[in-house]
């Protein structure tokens, strides 16, 4: 079962690193098969702000001058993308950087013009639309306008996170959810568990168009059902899409996704 570190932090005030929490879970009998950093394979990729652009004659390339903060304010990088504009902030993989899949970026000439790195799409960073909006757009990943040039890309796009891949044993069905693991983490760290706030009001409607009949009360002494009206199908909120994506699930719709989360 995949459990995002960031999701656990929503339930518990965790004051240890992911690696330290992994050791504590092991010591309490949980088998953490793998601790996966979301930014695995990514190094020396920073926020770059495009300060100059010029179309390279006779090619599909655009020559860009990129402000990468402490790494340099006038780094020249060519790109074949066409969806950026002057002033945009984009991921810049600098000379000597690495990307997922073992890809190494080096300064080289593109159509005879020196390029000191690569401007990246969301896909090249291992992102998808559910993890970070705009990641599946054809072209470069356009970052928020307030992104600071030279900042490491991981926290900007939400890759500063870890996934605990935990094997749940048959005697711990209570831990087959993120909330179940969070409850254990709270106990391990001696911290309070912050349960999700409920802001809906249940109304008893005796004339609801459903009935529930338990035909074997000796086997099922209690059964509960909720009838929900006025549901509007649509997209799930961004936070829910991200939670599901981190657990390896794809967002489908607000109704289906809520069932997956619950």
Task: Mark where each language-model region is.
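Phosphate-backbone binding interfaces of nucleic-acid-interacting proteins
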Residues: 1-202, 206
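Hydrophobic (often cysteine-bearing) scaffold residues that line and stabilize catalytic clefts
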Residues: 17, 178, 236-241, 252-255
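Residues forming anionic-ligand binding surfaces in small-molecule and nucleic-acid pockets
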Residues: 149-168, 207-246
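Conserved small/polar residues in nucleotide/adenosyl-binding loops
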Residues: 259-262
């Amino acid at each position: 079962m995949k459990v995002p570190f960031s999701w656990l932090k929503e339930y518990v005030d965790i004051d240890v690193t992911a690696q330290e929490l992994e050791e504590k879970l092991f010591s309490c009998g949980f088998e953490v098969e793998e601790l996966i950093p979301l930014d695995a394979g990514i190094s020396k990729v920073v926020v770059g702000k495009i300060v100059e652009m010029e179309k390279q004659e006779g090619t599909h390339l655009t020559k860009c001058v990129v402000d990468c903060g402490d790494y340099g304010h006038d780094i020249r990088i060519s790109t074949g993308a066409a969806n950026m504009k002057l002033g945009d902030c984009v991921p810049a993989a600098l000379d000597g950087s690495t990307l997922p899949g073992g890809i190494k970026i080096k300064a080289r000439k593109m159509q005879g013009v020196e390029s000191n790195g690569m401007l990246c799409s969301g896909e090249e960073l291992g992102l998808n639309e559910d993890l970070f909006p705009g990641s599946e757009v054809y072209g470069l990943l356009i970052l928020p306008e307030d992104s600071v040039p030279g900042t490491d890309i991981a926290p900007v796009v939400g890759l500063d996170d870890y996934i605990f891949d935990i094997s749940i044993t048959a005697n711990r069905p209570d831990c087959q959810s993120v909330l179940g693991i969070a409850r254990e983490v709270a106990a391990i760290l001696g911290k309070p568990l912050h349960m999700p706030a409920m802001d809906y009001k249940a109304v008893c409607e005796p004339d609801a168009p459903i009935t529930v009949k338990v035909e074997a009360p000796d086997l099922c002494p209690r059964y509960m059902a909720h009838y929900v009206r006025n549901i509007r199908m649509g997209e799930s909120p961004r936070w829910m899409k991200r939670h599901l994506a981190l657990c390896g699930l794809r967002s489908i719709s607000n109704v289906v996704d809520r069932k997956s989360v619950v």
